[in-house]
Every structure is written in structure tokens, then in C-alpha cells.
């Protein structure tokens, strides 16, 4: 595992055959230029990117259900987008082809596993999830291939 700033990765060009990013792309990958400018140089031609992104069932435009606000503030919720948003951002890449972008079939299992964790973030998420936030949240998976 590598811990590094996604804005300035410490690798040679064409270093990776594939990268996987779980539950963090929504923090830095919302800029349409990010994928091509910051990630593309490190992926070999034909290389893959596999993403698992916390998502919303639909966009709320700042008017969030109360159950979501039990664990997250509006600023945090602005980072959680729906599938259409991610399709638009990811398919705008000039360097990558979006092969797949959809809701994960193991969505409920992923949330249940997360909520069993005893770290402060999982514990903090429980209040919202126990109050119905799972009706609004999902996990989105995406696969891209470098052209």
C-alpha cells in the first residue's frame, strides 16, 4: 500500500499497470482535469484504474435529508455525488476510456462491514445509517482503461 498526496505522486512515468482507489476518489477526483493531469502519466498504455466511490442515489443540491446530517455536515456531503455525476467526470478524460460505472452489487455488505469497524469515522457514521441514510447512499464502482 502507498500513502501519498494524490496531487504529487512519487512515481516514474508509465510505472503502473493498474491502480485501485477505494473510498477516496470523491475527495480529489471531482476536477475533470485531475485524471488526465495527475494520474495518467503514471499509468501504462492499456493500464486500468479501478475505483470504489461513496455515492448518492441522487443529487440533493444542498437540501439533504435530516438523517444524512446526523453524521456529516453539508460541506462533507458535497463530496458525495451520484452515478451520473461520476460518469460525466470520468468519461470526459482524453486519456482513458470509461469501461464501466455503476452501483456496486455488494453495496449493503460494504456498508455493514464498514459500520462494524471501531474507528471514529465508522462509529460516527452509525447514527445516520441507523436513521435511514442507507436509502440515499450507495457505493459506485468504475473501471477505466488508458488509451
Regions found by a protein language model. Give the residues of each.
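Short, glycine-/aromatic-enriched active-site segment of Class I SAM-dependent methyltransferases
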Residues: 54-77
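Conserved Class I S-adenosyl-L-methionine
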Residues: 100-147
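Short alpha-helix
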Residues: 77-94, 100
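A short glycine-rich, Lys/Arg-flanked "PGG" loop and its adjoining helix->strand segment in the class I
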Residues: 32-48
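A short acidic, Gly/Pro-enriched loop at the edge of an enzyme's catalytic core
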Residues: 7-19
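A short SAM/SAH-binding and catalytic strip from SAM-dependent methyltransferases
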Residues: 17-32
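Alpha/beta-hydrolase-fold catalytic nucleophile elbow
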Residues: 22, 52-53
